[in-house]
């Protein structure tokens, strides 16, 4: 039977910055922990310890990323367990969160319907910030001024992982160096047009990143309830093992299933 948001006791994890590869592993570890009942349903706000490109589970590394440019800029390239497109991440310029929920929350819903459900609270928060934002199928959060963020989702073992990366600010020139975004189609104005396609929250709100996050959390708490929490030692240990055995290994990054 399908459950509702308020049927669950939601917990918040907002810890210190972590390495990009550890974030990938934490997503798997926490999804599995919720699936098994070892952890309550959780909202996790990510803090990044380093710049990164995160590619989707089914993307080709060669087609998506200029690895020479990534190395030149000191950007770590990692692969996540969910589908979707490549994300360009810089600490301080990005707001990323994951929701780890029992699969019952999205039972009977299509992926499109579940994206809309899982993004509704953040659209409410953006509205409180004066931004008219909407869900644009399949996985974008958009506004009149341009794209704000992108979502990805996977379902595994009785749980659903839904995560979103939103641009607080953006270095469009660097992004275009590292990501292969239709380079053959880009004119000399490519950087300008790419920047227009993404309209960051900083320019739309005028607020510091921390205040945007605080307003987001206030909306989630008001709508669904939210209790403070932290990563447990066992969860971190499991994530570090996943880094060694999977996410930090070359085959995972290079492999396309």
What are these language model-derived features?
Residues 1-68, 72, 80, 182, ...:
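Active-site loop/lid in soluble adenylation, ligation, and acyl-transfer enzymes
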Residues 67, 87-222, 244-257:
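Catalytic beta-strand/loop module used to bind and position nucleotide/cofactor moieties
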């Amino acid at each position: 039977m399908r459950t509702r948001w308020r049927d669950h006791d939601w917990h918040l994890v907002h810890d210190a910055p972590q390495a990009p590869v550890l974030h990938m592993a934490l997503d798997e570890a926490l999804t599995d922990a919720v699936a098994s009942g070892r952890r309550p349903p959780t909202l996790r706000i990510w803090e990044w310890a380093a710049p990164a490109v995160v590619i989707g589970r089914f993307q080709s590394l060669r087609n998506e990323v200029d690895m020479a440019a990534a190395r030149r800029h000191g950007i770590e390239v990692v692969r996540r367990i969910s589908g979707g497109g490549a994300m360009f991440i810089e600490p301080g310029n990005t707001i990323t969160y994951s929701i780890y929920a029992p699969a019952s929350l999205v039972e009977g819903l299509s992926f499109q319907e579940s994206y809309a459900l899982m993004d509704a609270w953040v659209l409410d928060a953006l509205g409180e910030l004066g931004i008219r934002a909407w869900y644009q199928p399949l996985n974008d959060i958009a506004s009149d001024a341009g794209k704000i963020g992108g979502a990805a989702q996977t379902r595994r073992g009785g749980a659903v992982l839904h995560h979103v990366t939103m641009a607080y600010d953006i270095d469009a020139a660097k992004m275009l160096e590292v990501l292969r975004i239709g380079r053959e189609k880009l004119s000399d104005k490519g950087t300008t047009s790419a920047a227009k396609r993404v309209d960051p929250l900083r320019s739309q709100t005028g607020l510091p990143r921390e205040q945007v996050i605080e307003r987001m959390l206030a909306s989630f708490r008001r709508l669904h309830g939210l209790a403070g929490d932290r990563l447990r030692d066992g969860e971190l240990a499991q994530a570090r093992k996943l880094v060694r055995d999977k996410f930090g290994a070359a085959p995972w990054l290079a492999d396309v299933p």
